[in-house]
Amino acid sequence: MVLAMLGALHPRAGLSLFLHLILAVALLRSQPLRSQRSVPEAFSAPLELSQPLSGLVDDYGILPKHPRPRGPRPLLSRAQQRKRDGPDLAEYYYDAHL
Protein backbone atom coordinates (compact mmCIF):
# COMPACT_ATOMS: atom_id res chain seq x y z
CA MET A 1 0.00 0.00 0.00
CA VAL A 2 2.86 2.33 0.82
CA LEU A 3 4.42 1.49 -2.53
CA ALA A 4 1.15 2.35 -4.28
CA MET A 5 1.03 5.71 -2.51
CA LEU A 6 4.64 6.47 -3.42
CA GLY A 7 3.95 5.38 -6.98
CA ALA A 8 1.12 7.89 -7.19
CA LEU A 9 3.43 10.69 -6.08
CA HIS A 10 6.45 9.74 -8.11
CA PRO A 11 6.54 6.71 -10.42
CA ARG A 12 10.22 5.93 -9.87
CA ALA A 13 10.16 6.39 -6.09
CA GLY A 14 8.25 3.17 -5.51
CA LEU A 15 10.61 1.18 -7.70
CA SER A 16 13.64 2.74 -6.04
CA LEU A 17 12.34 1.94 -2.55
CA PHE A 18 11.50 -1.62 -3.60
CA LEU A 19 14.99 -2.16 -5.04
CA HIS A 20 16.61 -0.73 -1.92
CA LEU A 21 14.58 -3.09 0.27
CA ILE A 22 15.60 -6.09 -1.84
CA LEU A 23 19.24 -5.03 -1.69
CA ALA A 24 19.10 -4.58 2.10
CA VAL A 25 17.53 -8.02 2.59
CA ALA A 26 20.14 -9.63 0.34
CA LEU A 27 22.99 -7.97 2.22
CA LEU A 28 21.60 -8.94 5.62
CA ARG A 29 21.24 -12.57 4.59
CA SER A 30 24.77 -12.79 3.17
CA GLN A 31 26.46 -11.67 6.42
CA PRO A 32 26.43 -15.09 8.18
CA LEU A 33 27.96 -16.75 5.11
CA ARG A 34 31.16 -14.74 5.46
CA SER A 35 31.92 -16.20 8.87
CA GLN A 36 31.42 -19.73 7.51
CA ARG A 37 33.86 -19.10 4.64
CA SER A 38 36.76 -18.21 6.92
CA VAL A 39 39.88 -20.36 6.73
CA PRO A 40 40.23 -22.87 9.59
CA GLU A 41 43.25 -22.57 11.89
CA ALA A 42 44.71 -25.85 10.60
CA PHE A 43 45.23 -24.35 7.14
CA SER A 44 46.80 -21.06 8.17
CA ALA A 45 50.45 -20.50 7.27
CA PRO A 46 53.12 -20.54 10.00
CA LEU A 47 54.36 -17.15 11.06
CA GLU A 48 57.98 -18.27 11.46
CA LEU A 49 60.23 -20.34 9.24
CA SER A 50 60.62 -23.94 10.33
CA GLN A 51 64.30 -23.99 9.25
CA PRO A 52 66.69 -21.06 9.43
CA LEU A 53 67.94 -19.70 6.14
CA SER A 54 71.21 -21.32 5.14
CA GLY A 55 73.42 -18.69 3.57
CA LEU A 56 72.01 -16.58 0.80
CA VAL A 57 70.41 -19.29 -1.32
CA ASP A 58 67.37 -18.09 -3.23
CA ASP A 59 64.16 -20.01 -3.96
CA TYR A 60 65.86 -22.06 -6.68
CA GLY A 61 68.89 -23.04 -4.57
CA ILE A 62 71.28 -20.73 -6.41
CA LEU A 63 73.74 -18.48 -4.65
CA PRO A 64 73.48 -14.94 -6.01
CA LYS A 65 76.51 -13.36 -7.60
CA HIS A 66 77.85 -10.40 -5.74
CA PRO A 67 79.58 -7.70 -7.74
CA ARG A 68 83.22 -7.17 -7.04
CA PRO A 69 83.95 -3.84 -5.42
CA ARG A 70 85.14 -1.57 -8.18
CA GLY A 71 87.32 1.41 -7.79
CA PRO A 72 86.98 4.51 -9.89
CA ARG A 73 86.08 3.65 -13.47
CA PRO A 74 88.70 4.41 -16.07
CA LEU A 75 87.82 7.13 -18.50
CA LEU A 76 86.21 5.79 -21.61
CA SER A 77 88.13 6.30 -24.78
CA ARG A 78 86.41 8.22 -27.53
CA ALA A 79 85.60 5.00 -29.43
CA GLN A 80 83.92 3.44 -26.39
CA GLN A 81 81.63 6.35 -25.56
CA ARG A 82 77.98 5.66 -26.06
CA LYS A 83 75.50 8.03 -27.62
CA ARG A 84 73.51 8.36 -24.42
CA ASP A 85 76.59 9.68 -22.59
CA GLY A 86 76.44 12.85 -24.65
CA PRO A 87 79.37 14.98 -25.75
CA ASP A 88 82.27 15.72 -23.43
CA LEU A 89 81.84 19.43 -22.84
CA ALA A 90 85.37 19.74 -21.51
CA GLU A 91 86.63 19.31 -25.09
CA TYR A 92 84.91 22.55 -26.13
CA TYR A 93 86.72 24.82 -23.67
CA TYR A 94 90.43 25.51 -24.01
CA ASP A 95 90.89 26.27 -20.30
CA ALA A 96 89.15 23.16 -18.93
CA HIS A 97 92.42 21.40 -18.05
CA LEU A 98 94.12 24.39 -16.36
UniProtKB/Swiss-Prot annotation:
Where does the signal sequence lie? none
Q: Is Hydrolase set as a keyword in this record?
A: no
- GO BP of this protein: fusion of sperm to egg plasma membrane involved in single fertilization; gene expression; maintenance of protein localization in endoplasmic reticulum; protein N-linked glycosylation; protein stabilization; protein ubiquitination; protein-containing complex assembly; sperm-egg recognition
Arranged from A to Z, the UniProt key words for this protein are: Endoplasmic reticulum, Membrane, Transmembrane, Transmembrane helix
Query: InterPro entries, from UniProt?
Result: Frey (IPR031748)
Subcellular localization: Endoplasmic reticulum membrane
- How would you describe this protein's topology in the membrane? Single-pass type II membrane protein
Entry's Gene Ontology cellular component terms: endoplasmic reticulum membrane
Location of the region described as Disordered in the Swiss-Prot/TrEMBL record: 60-87
Q: Where are the transmembrane segments?
A: 13-29
Keyword Transmembrane in the entry? The reply is: yes
> Please, which domain of life does this record's source organism belong to?
Eukaryota
Q: Name one GO molecular function term.
A: protein-macromolecule adaptor activity
A Pfam family annotated for this chain is Frey
Subunit record text: Interacts with SPPL2C (via active sites); the interaction stabilizes FREY1 protein and inhibits SPPL2C proteolytic activity. Interacts with IZUMO1; the interaction retains IZUMO1 at the endoplasmic reticulum membrane and coordinates IZUMO1 complex assembly.
Question: What is this protein's function per UniProt?
Answer: Key regulator for male fertility expressed transiently in round spermatids where it recruits IZUMO1 at the endoplasmic reticulum (ER) membrane and coordinates the oolemmal binding multimeric complex (IZUMO1 complex) assembly. Upon complete assembly of the IZUMO1 complex, its ER retention is released, facilitating IZUMO1 complex export to the acrosome. Through the interaction with SPPL2C, inhibits its intramembrane protease activity directly accessing the catalytic center of an I-CLiP.
UniProt name for this protein: Protein Frey 1
- Protein source organism: Homo sapiens (Human)
